[in-house]
Every structure is written in structure tokens, then in C-alpha cells.
């Protein structure tokens, strides 16, 4: 999987605050759209202090490439205000405090722990949830169940890398529909391929 997906990319954002905001912007959009919106936003408002005072219409214009820009603009401004008021302008480093921020769920909070603080955490999105179940690593119904199950099944030293690898693999190979099983290096050991997908691809 590492050979196909590639090694984890180095997060280019300079601050923990920028990692948090970019992760919120990444919800329900493509990576390239997130990158464009983040670059435009941080050029004008690189800190929580500046973003908390920015006009909402200006934020909306800058993050428009990320989609759902009106909702996201309200969220990231509200987050910035709370960070300034409660956390000295920086994201908190605990899961519980991150979850207290507007628009921050478990996946977003765990991504911030991983990429901003380099803490072991298990971000689970649709790709991680799908691939984990297809490979038989877990048998779960929800991303939260998958998170807990993977934390038990995967060695802690691999947690930081797992999200990146599975997301990239889910985008390239293990697609939601018509997965490219014959291109997958794991297909000979994959229960999904052996039990059902194989019949569709041979």
C-alpha cells in the first residue's frame, strides 16, 4: 500500500492554526481545492487574530474554491474567535477541546492531532472506513467504531501514517464503486475481492 499511495506528504502550512483551518476547509472537497483556498486565505489572514477580525464576505471570497464557502467561512471565523478568546490564538492539543470548536468532528480533530501536533491518533474518513472493512481489518458500521477498532488492531507507531496511506489508496485503487482490485497488491489477501469483487473483474 505504501508503494502505491506514496509516503505521507509533508504538511506545508507553517502553523498549527493553519493546519486546523485547512482541515476544516477540506471537508467535502478535493485536495487541490483545499490547497487553493488555503493559500488564498492565509496570504491575507495567516493567524487566528487576523482571521477573527476579517469581514465574513472577504473570507467567503477567498475560500470559495473549497465549496460550501458560506458555511465554512462562518465556521472558521467562529473557530478563530474562540481560539483567541480561550486558547491564546492557537489550537488546543487535546481531542476533547478540539471537539468543542464549531465544525470540528472526530475526524477533523484527529487529523489536527496527527498533522499539527504529531500525536498518535486515528483519523477515519470514508476511505479509511471502507478500506478497513474491505480488507477485513475491522467489521464495523460507523467511522467511530472503525476508529476504536483500528486503534486496537494497528500498532501505535503506524497510526500517524495510516490515514494518509488509506486516503490515497482509496482515491487511486480501492474506489467506492468499481474498485481496481486487480491493480491492488493486497487483492490476494482481501476478503472483499475473494468473496465478491473477484466475480465482477474476471
What are these regions (language model features)?
Residues 1-202:
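Catalytic cores of DNA base-excision repair glycosylases
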Amino acid at each position: 500500500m505504501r508503494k502505491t499511495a506514496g509516503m505521507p506528504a509533508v504538511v506545508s502550512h507553517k502553523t498549527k492554526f493553519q493546519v486546523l483551518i485547512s482541515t476544516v476547509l477540506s471537508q467535502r472537497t478535493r485536495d487541490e481545492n483545499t490547497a487553493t483556498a488555503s493559500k488564498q486565505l492565509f496570504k491575507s489572514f495567516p493567524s487566528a487574530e487576523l482571521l477573527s477580525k476579517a469581514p465574513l464576505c472577504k473570507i467567503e471570497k477567498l475560500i470559495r474554491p473549497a465549496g460550501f464557502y458560506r458555511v465554512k467561512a462562518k465556521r472558521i471565523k467562529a473557530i478563530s474567535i474562540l481560539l483567541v478568546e480561550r486558547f491564546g490564538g492557537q489550537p488546543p492539543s487535546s481531542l476533547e477541546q478540539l471537539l468543542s470548536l464549531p465544525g470540528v468532528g472526530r475526524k477533523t480533530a484527529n487529523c489536527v492531532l496527527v498533522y499539527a501536533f504529531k500525536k498518535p491518533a486515528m483519523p477515519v474518513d470514508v476511505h479509511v472506513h471502507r478500506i478497513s472493512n474491505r480488507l477485513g481489518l475491522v467489521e464495523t458500521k460507523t467511522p467511530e467504531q472503525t476508529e476504536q477498532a483500528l486503534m486496537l488492531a494497528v500498532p501505535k507507531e503506524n497510526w500517524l501514517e495510516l490515514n494518509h496511506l488509506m486516503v490515497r489508496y482509496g482515491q487511486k485503487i480501492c474506489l467506492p464503486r468499481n474498485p481496481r482490485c486487480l491493480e491492488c497488491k493486497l487483492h490476494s489477501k482481501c476478503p472483499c475481492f475473494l468473496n465478491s469483487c473477484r466475480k465482477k473483474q474476471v
